[in-house]
Amino acid sequence: MTTATGTKPKKMEAFKMERGVKYRDAAKTSVIQVRNIDPDQELLPKPSWMKIKLPAASAKIDSIKHGMRRHGLHSVCEEASCPNLHECFNHGTATFMIMGAICTRRCPFCDVAHGKPLPLDLEEPRKVAETVQDMKLKYVVITSVDRDDLADRGAAHFAATVREIKALNPECKVEILVPDFRGRVEQAVEILKQNPPDVFNHNLENVPRLYREVRPGADYKWSLELLKIFKQEFPNIPTKSGLMVGLGETNEEILEVMQDLRDHGVTMLTIGQYLQPSRHHLKVERYVPPEEFDMFRSEAERMGFEHAACGPFVRSSYHADLQAKGELVK
């Protein structure tokens, strides 16, 4: 599998993607017409609270990477350039990204590669289950790229992965972080009913006013409907969603989205700072100070969320096992 990071093609109509090629940076975002991303833009300097010292390489980090490579698997930690990778790998945890490492969407905030994906690896659910067993995990998060090329948008592959993990690791808790199953929401939930997870997660990402820029191809109401339908089918399974801040939204808009989530039955929330993966992605409009994250958490508690992890480096799967236990994560 190769990676393309080149500059914008001069004639977009003549540009044809090759199947299996991972398009990143300018090769990915230059065709998004919503907002002009200027690679020469002046970037905001990072404030003190956004500067962290990465831990040294460790045997655990190498072990997890080796385990992933050995089974031909992917972690969203690496593919999305997560800032918490070293911390999570050092703690022996990782979030598996199934259905390949090529996404059919090209969201300009995300560092996951875009392109024409390869066919599904039907052995992947078993490989994930075996890796979970090898790593002796008690809590695992499974996410995926968007697969708009599949009739069920990948729902059956999620269900198969949950089934295989549970069969081989009956004590392991499984959280799934799913895409929006565009146009197939009810069908997808019906498929997931066969092998329900312990936590159901779908990220809204940001506020509806900015959706066209931040999540081209997605729809705010569709995402809320997905969360609502799943909760109606499984009222006892926690539903969860995550937001990024610093993309130009206001705090008032974030609070409105939080209330929308509660109105649709969501009980768990994550809010973290957006970080620009490269100069070819949406720029950071603002670094939100820690005290504002504390405010979001307080408001979430007031609204009735059972758990809210809010902090600059919080991500959906960051210490997801602790989130599920209701412990403070920030």
From Swiss-Prot:
EC number: 2.8.1.8
Catalytic activity: [[Fe-S] cluster scaffold protein carrying a second [4Fe-4S](2+) cluster] + N(6)-octanoyl-L-lysyl-[protein] + 2 oxidized [2Fe-2S]-[ferredoxin] + 2 S-adenosyl-L-methionine + 4 H(+) = [[Fe-S] cluster scaffold protein] + N(6)-[(R)-dihydrolipoyl]-L-lysyl-[protein] + 4 Fe(3+) + 2 hydrogen sulfide + 2 5'-deoxyadenosine + 2 L-methionine + 2 reduced [2Fe-2S]-[ferredoxin]
Any one GO cellular component localisation term in the record: cytoplasm
Cofactor binding mode and count: Binds 2 [4Fe-4S] clusters per subunit. One cluster is coordinated with 3 cysteines and an exchangeable S-adenosyl-L-methionine.
Residues annotated to bind [4Fe-4S] cluster 1: C77, C82, C88, S317
Biological pathway: Protein modification; protein lipoylation via endogenous pathway; protein N(6)-(lipoyl)lysine from octanoyl-[acyl-carrier-protein]: step 2/2
Entry GO MF terms: 4 iron, 4 sulfur cluster binding; lipoate synthase activity; metal ion binding
The UniProt record lists the keyword Isomerase: no
First-level EC class: transferase
UniProt entry keywords in alphabetical sequence: 4Fe-4S, Cytoplasm, Iron, Iron-sulfur, Metal-binding, S-adenosyl-L-methionine, Transferase
The keyword Cytoplasm is assigned to this record: yes
Listed InterPro entries: Aldolase_TIM, Elp3/MiaA/NifB-like_rSAM, Lipoyl_synth, rSAM
Protein name: Lipoyl synthase
Required cofactor(s): [4Fe-4S] cluster
UniProt record similarity statement: Belongs to the radical SAM superfamily. Lipoyl synthase family.
Any Pfam family: Radical_SAM
